[in-house]
Swiss-Prot record:
<keyword id="KW-1035">Host cytoplasm</keyword>
<keyword id="KW-0167">Capsid protein</keyword>
<protein>
    <recommendedName>
        <fullName>Minor outer capsid protein P9</fullName>
    </recommendedName>
</protein>
<dbReference type="InterPro" id="IPR008776">
    <property type="entry name" value="Phyto_Pns9_10"/>
</dbReference>
<dbReference type="GO" id="GO:0030430">
    <property type="term" value="C:host cell cytoplasm"/>
</dbReference>
<dbReference type="GO" id="GO:0039624">
    <property type="term" value="C:viral outer capsid"/>
</dbReference>
<comment type="function">
    <text>Minor outer capsid protein.</text>
</comment>
<keyword id="KW-0946">Virion</keyword>
<dbReference type="Pfam" id="PF05878">
    <property type="entry name" value="Phyto_Pns9_10"/>
</dbReference>
<keyword id="KW-1152">Outer capsid protein</keyword>
<comment type="similarity">
    <text>Belongs to the phytoreovirus minor outer capsid protein P9 family.</text>
</comment>
Amino acid sequence: MSGKIQDGVAIRRMSDAILFFTNYTSRNLIDQRDITLSTLHTIRRNLGTCWSIALLNCWNETSSHAGVMRFILDIAFSLRFGDFTMLGACGNVDPFDDAGQIFLKSCKATGRNDSCFLTPSDNFGYYLVSFLNKEQLKCVVDMNVGIHNIEDIYVTRMESIMEFIYYYYTESGRDVVNWLEKLESADAGLAAHAKSKRLMRAEIDLIRREILERTRLFINNNRNSFHDHHRELVRRYRTIWADVISDGDVVEETSTEATTSAQHSTALSAELDEVDEYDHPNDGLLTFRREEDAASNLDSLLGSLSGEDAFQG
């Protein structure tokens, strides 16, 4: 199927995705699950097969970059067997003639320009495109067949997601200066959605720290899980991170993800407030809005899966 819509509608739909990830904070999928799933349900249905393109462009855009990464992190550390399907396309409708062009128009309409985009290396850029395109296809589960072996698919897809997170961690540590090449270095006078090199560097550093904290915590909390698929996932995560996280690095059993999240939030506020005072003395850059007009809550099926729209029958 292929249906094309007017640019005005297309821009609004793409802008909804940008806003969603601009507002997305760590653990939204856990702590604000109902409203997050409702909003995401609408966005994915509107974008259809352009979902991976929207994710790609939101990852590249500085104000929504952290939201995309934390959304992917929330999926990677979820114990719900169907959450990975949120990276899959919703339906097979292609609503836009040129999704990339629609994204650029959406950015222009909301005051974003070329200085609002990251510039990862060609190798990482190719990997990112390949990863998102692959997950858009492979994270869709056949309702007639896949539902019966959802646990096995869960382990395979989560391993793929964690491999991407690991690659992000290593590449952002090695090549972050080049990623920030197009960003402004001015101390003030930046557009509302722009971020200086210093501020974006601080955000990426915090994401990298969160990746390590949550990976250690997930391994620690689930290595003795009663569910064999969760134990298998822990084994694969440990293999992926073997050169970074050793057995001695695993946190104590008494630690909780909520504690880690609170510590991370405190660090985020302290570090970014310091940077923001220097780079953005007047704009409300770090004020996260909450959408109050989300659609009604999804069916309880979303408690274990990510909604019927993720499946193809």
